[in-house]
Amino acid sequence: MTNIRKTHPLMKIIDNSFIDLPTPSNISAWWNFGSLLGICLILQILTGLFLAMHYTSDTTTAFSSVTHICRDVNYGWIIRYLHANGASMFFICLYMHVGRGLYYGSYTFTETWNIGIILLFTVMATAFMGYVLPWGQMSFWGATVITNLLSAIPYVGTDLVQWIWGGFSVDKATLTRFFAFHFILPFVVSALAAVHLLFLHETGSNNPSGIMSNSDKIPFHPYYTIKDILGALLLILVLTLLVLFSPDLLGDPDNYIPANPLSTPPHIKPEWYFLFAYAILRSIPNKLGGVLALVLSILILAIVPLLHTSKQRGMMFRPISQCLFWFLVADLLTLTWIGGQPVEHPYITIGQLASILYFMILLVLMPIASIIENNILKW
């Protein structure tokens, strides 16, 4: 009798995706982040669902409803902090996942890569709208500043901003629609993730060497299910430590002050995972230029496959490109630090230099390094 998992229409899909999936035998721990992102997404949807049961999307009660969740709801505090810090873990895994793709040349699977970029934008939009919901000072002013950037679009900018706001300022209408979008977008992310996997399984996974591995593949289960469980346990450990010992470590103290349109916080800044893009935005004095740089800082990933000049796929055997990659990582950490600093003398210049370097590495230096490496190897 044939095994039900190989014949049943639904079980067959699960079997081909997670059990009998042929997987390269040499993929490292850097390939764990896909499954970790899936775990993060499930965690965020579940904790978000329970938070939505108690949250009210009205400007007069939003802040106090979050306080009520933390103080009066059974284990409400842990659900709230799992959700808030779960978002941080989500972005750590996302950036590691994208970094792995850049390092090992996974971007040559263009469909998978492009859907990944759409996923990144969608998750960023979801996180931004979620940050507005507690209706603290940073929620309100963050929403005001970021949505206001759209007014830089010629002709339609101002109308577009007022259309998003649902009025002439960030108010009740804005909060209600942000809550609605924040609720629905994770399900859009889930659907996109399924398409992302669909395209990935058309080609099969890449591996650290970047060489075709069809001749040497092993079933996903039990080898990689065990490996993924280890990664998941480590993720849960870090998240648990964060939630139970320092839940506000990555948050902003200003968000414990109820939103007040009449009082501007001294330093308006988004959550830590957007600081690199915020630093790029701030480093350009022109408003439209800043907005374009902000969008391009992520959209540049879509151009990376077109700029691949190396004869090798990954960077495993390319020392010059490796150096540039780690320069890029250091540059992004510098931008993250700058994004959290006030707009004054040394920080402005450092931010501008780091922003120029970011685009230079991806657009100019990496393609040149690849050509040099090809010539060194006489390819």
UniProtKB/Swiss-Prot annotation:
<keyword id="KW-0679">Respiratory chain</keyword>
<dbReference type="InterPro" id="IPR027387">
    <property type="entry name" value="Cytb/b6-like_sf"/>
</dbReference>
<dbReference type="GO" id="GO:0008121">
    <property type="term" value="F:ubiquinol-cytochrome-c reductase activity"/>
</dbReference>
<keyword id="KW-0479">Metal-binding</keyword>
<feature type="binding site" description="axial binding residue">
    <location>
        <position position="97"/>
    </location>
    <ligand>
        <name>heme b b566</name>
    </ligand>
</feature>
<keyword id="KW-0813">Transport</keyword>
<feature type="transmembrane region" description="Helical">
    <location>
        <begin position="347"/>
        <end position="367"/>
    </location>
</feature>
<feature type="transmembrane region" description="Helical">
    <location>
        <begin position="320"/>
        <end position="340"/>
    </location>
</feature>
<dbReference type="Pfam" id="PF00032">
    <property type="entry name" value="Cytochrom_B_C"/>
</dbReference>
<dbReference type="InterPro" id="IPR048260">
    <property type="entry name" value="Cytochrome_b_C_euk/bac"/>
</dbReference>
<feature type="transmembrane region" description="Helical">
    <location>
        <begin position="113"/>
        <end position="133"/>
    </location>
</feature>
<keyword id="KW-0408">Iron</keyword>
<keyword id="KW-0496">Mitochondrion</keyword>
<feature type="transmembrane region" description="Helical">
    <location>
        <begin position="226"/>
        <end position="246"/>
    </location>
</feature>
<feature type="binding site" description="axial binding residue">
    <location>
        <position position="182"/>
    </location>
    <ligand>
        <name>heme b b562</name>
    </ligand>
</feature>
<feature type="transmembrane region" description="Helical">
    <location>
        <begin position="33"/>
        <end position="53"/>
    </location>
</feature>
<dbReference type="GO" id="GO:0005743">
    <property type="term" value="C:mitochondrial inner membrane"/>
</dbReference>
<dbReference type="InterPro" id="IPR016174">
    <property type="entry name" value="Di-haem_cyt_TM"/>
</dbReference>
<feature type="transmembrane region" description="Helical">
    <location>
        <begin position="288"/>
        <end position="308"/>
    </location>
</feature>
<dbReference type="GO" id="GO:0046872">
    <property type="term" value="F:metal ion binding"/>
</dbReference>
<protein>
    <recommendedName>
        <fullName>Cytochrome b</fullName>
    </recommendedName>
</protein>
<dbReference type="InterPro" id="IPR005798">
    <property type="entry name" value="Cyt_b/b6_C"/>
</dbReference>
<comment type="similarity">
    <text>Belongs to the cytochrome b family.</text>
</comment>
<keyword id="KW-0349">Heme</keyword>
<keyword id="KW-0830">Ubiquinone</keyword>
<feature type="transmembrane region" description="Helical">
    <location>
        <begin position="178"/>
        <end position="198"/>
    </location>
</feature>
<dbReference type="InterPro" id="IPR030689">
    <property type="entry name" value="Cytochrome_b"/>
</dbReference>
<comment type="subunit">
    <text>The cytochrome bc1 complex contains 11 subunits: 3 respiratory subunits (MT-CYB, CYC1 and UQCRFS1), 2 core proteins (UQCRC1 and UQCRC2) and 6 low-molecular weight proteins (UQCRH/QCR6, UQCRB/QCR7, UQCRQ/QCR8, UQCR10/QCR9, UQCR11/QCR10 and a cleavage product of UQCRFS1). This cytochrome bc1 complex then forms a dimer.</text>
</comment>
<dbReference type="Pfam" id="PF00033">
    <property type="entry name" value="Cytochrome_B"/>
</dbReference>
<feature type="transmembrane region" description="Helical">
    <location>
        <begin position="77"/>
        <end position="98"/>
    </location>
</feature>
<feature type="binding site" description="axial binding residue">
    <location>
        <position position="196"/>
    </location>
    <ligand>
        <name>heme b b566</name>
    </ligand>
</feature>
<dbReference type="InterPro" id="IPR005797">
    <property type="entry name" value="Cyt_b/b6_N"/>
</dbReference>
<keyword id="KW-1133">Transmembrane helix</keyword>
<dbReference type="InterPro" id="IPR048259">
    <property type="entry name" value="Cytochrome_b_N_euk/bac"/>
</dbReference>
<feature type="binding site" description="axial binding residue">
    <location>
        <position position="83"/>
    </location>
    <ligand>
        <name>heme b b562</name>
    </ligand>
</feature>
<keyword id="KW-0999">Mitochondrion inner membrane</keyword>
<keyword id="KW-0249">Electron transport</keyword>
<comment type="function">
    <text>Component of the ubiquinol-cytochrome c reductase complex (complex III or cytochrome b-c1 complex) that is part of the mitochondrial respiratory chain. The b-c1 complex mediates electron transfer from ubiquinol to cytochrome c. Contributes to the generation of a proton gradient across the mitochondrial membrane that is then used for ATP synthesis.</text>
</comment>
<keyword id="KW-0812">Transmembrane</keyword>
<dbReference type="GO" id="GO:0006122">
    <property type="term" value="P:mitochondrial electron transport, ubiquinol to cytochrome c"/>
</dbReference>
<feature type="binding site">
    <location>
        <position position="201"/>
    </location>
    <ligand>
        <name>a ubiquinone</name>
    </ligand>
</feature>
<keyword id="KW-0472">Membrane</keyword>
